[in-house]
Structures are given as structure tokens and as C-alpha cells.
A protein has these predicted regions:
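Two-component system phosphorelay core
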Residues: 1-59, 63-121
Length: 121
């Protein structure tokens, strides 16, 4: 840390995530549907984490991996696939928890990109 600049923030605010289809008028309604469902998916992921339910977490990640990629959210799809694949290969619980939290953060960033949405869960 440069002592002349003062303390640096611990985490930079990360930019919202937008669908690669966000400028496609034919896909707008479908993308909006997916985004509207993300809050429920986040809540389900958190519930599975709280219950230490690896089976549910893997199922949710698997479903989200396919859906996110199909709606133009490749970053979310890749993160969800990584969680799904990791759990299927018996990754450590701490690693699964970290990947799930990262996935939840990505989903929250996508929700924050929606006009009129002030925050995400």
C-alpha cells in the first residue's frame, strides 16, 4: 500500500453483469424472465448452503449452468458449471461454499443491472 494514497478499499464494487442478448429486442422478454427468477435461485442456493446439502447445491448449480448460458450470462453459467463439476468430484466443503458464494455474487450483479432494481439479495 502506498502510504501517500491512504488505505485502499478492501473490495472494489464490481460492475453489474449484463446478458450478451441484452441489446437483442427478440430476446429481451426471455432475459427479463431469467433475471426475474434469479432471486428465487439465489434463495435456493443459500438454503442449500445453510443446510450443507451438497446434493441440492449440485442440482441447483447444474440447472443454473444451463439456463444462464442459454440466456447470455456466460460468466454465471461457467461459475455454476464449476460448482456442479466440483461437487460431483467431491471437492472440499470449504471450496464448494466459496464457489457457491461467488456464484451468488455473480447472480446478484446480474440482478443489479436490471433498471429499477436497487439491490439484489
Amino acid at each position: 500500500m502506498d502510504r501517500h494514497q491512504g488505505p485502499q478499499p478492501r473490495r472494489e464494487a464490481k460492475a453489474p453483469i449484463r446478458s450478451s442478448f441484452s441489446d437483442d429486442p427478440e430476446m429481451r422478454e426471455l432475459v427479463d424472465y431469467f433475471l426475474g427468477d434469479l432471486t428465487r435461485r439465489i434463495e435456493s442456493l443459500r438454503s442449500a448452503l445453510d443446510a450443507d446439502d451438497a446434493h441440492a447445491l449440485r442440482r441447483l448449480a447444474h440447472q443454473l449452468a444451463g439456463a444462464a448460458a442459454g440466456y447470455g450470462f456466460d460468466e454465471i453459467g461457467q461459475a455454476a458449471h464449476g460448482l456442479d463439476d466440483g461437487i460431483s468430484h467431491e471437492m472440499a466443503v470449504s471450496d464448494a461454499r466459496e464457489r457457491a458464494e461467488d456464484l451468488i455474487e455473480l447472480c446478484s450483479r446480474a440482478i443489479r443491472a436490471v433498471p429499477g432494481e436497487g439491490h439484489a439479495p
